[in-house]
């Protein structure tokens, strides 16, 4: 949620350079359409694609298109990537504000990171779910030992990256193509370049990552 978690002021630091040049934006998790509207207003020259498990076509307009996609399904993500490749569609910005489940965050990152343009930005919102306790319900998804072991905050804080939900081929691509990772835990910002500071000691408060491609 772009406005609800006050992300906008933080994103400006990273996205302003793309504001006039961006042509394609993708957001996973549409909810009430407010974030799509924010991207529509901010990136005046960009087409925006929304992906959600529910039909959100009511938010379509001249530059916004919505499609049904379940990010828990590798098959559906693969089909989306295949369609983008067929249409030569790449993105300046991809935002994952979907299920917030750590497995889904990593599966989606592994599949969609290739769709970023050089210097493109990939954002994963609400990684505070990495700290939910075993057995706790995460927006309808149950936290498990495996998810706690490979939570998304720890995943992004370590190199080379290892994930049971991302193929070796995609992990190699990610490790070779990431320029930097920035993690912020409202209201503090942690920018680390190629060195990462673990933030595991901080309480879970809408932790978000900003990942730039080379």
Q: Model-derived features: where do they sit?
A:
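A short alpha-helical cap/connector motif
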Residues: 1-95, 99-124, 128-214
């Amino acid at each position: 949620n772009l406005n609800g978690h006050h992300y906008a002021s933080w994103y400006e630091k990273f996205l302003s350079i793309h504001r006039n040049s961006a042509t394609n934006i993708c957001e996973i998790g549409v909810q009430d359409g407010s974030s799509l509207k924010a991207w529509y207003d901010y990136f005046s020259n960009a087409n925006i694609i929304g992906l959600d498990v529910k039909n959100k076509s009511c938010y379509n307009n001249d530059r916004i298109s919505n499609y049904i996609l379940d990010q828990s399904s590798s098959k559906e993500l693969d089909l989306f990537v295949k369609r983008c490749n067929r249409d030569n569609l790449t993105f300046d910005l991809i935002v994952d504000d979907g299920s917030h489940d750590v497995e889904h965050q990593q599966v989606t990152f592994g599949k969609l990171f290739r769709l970023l343009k050089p210097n493109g930005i990939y954002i994963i919102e609400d990684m505070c779910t990495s700290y939910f306790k075993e057995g706790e319900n995460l927006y309808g998804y149950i936290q498990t030992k495996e998810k706690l072991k490979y939570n998304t905050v720890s995943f992004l804080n370590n190199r080379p990256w290892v994930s049971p939900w991302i193929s070796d081929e995609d992990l190699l691509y990610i490790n070779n193509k990431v320029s930097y990772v920035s993690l912020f835990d409202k209201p503090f910002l942690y920018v680390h370049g190629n060195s990462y500071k673990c933030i595991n000691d901080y309480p879970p408060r809408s932790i978000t990552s900003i990942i730039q491609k080379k």
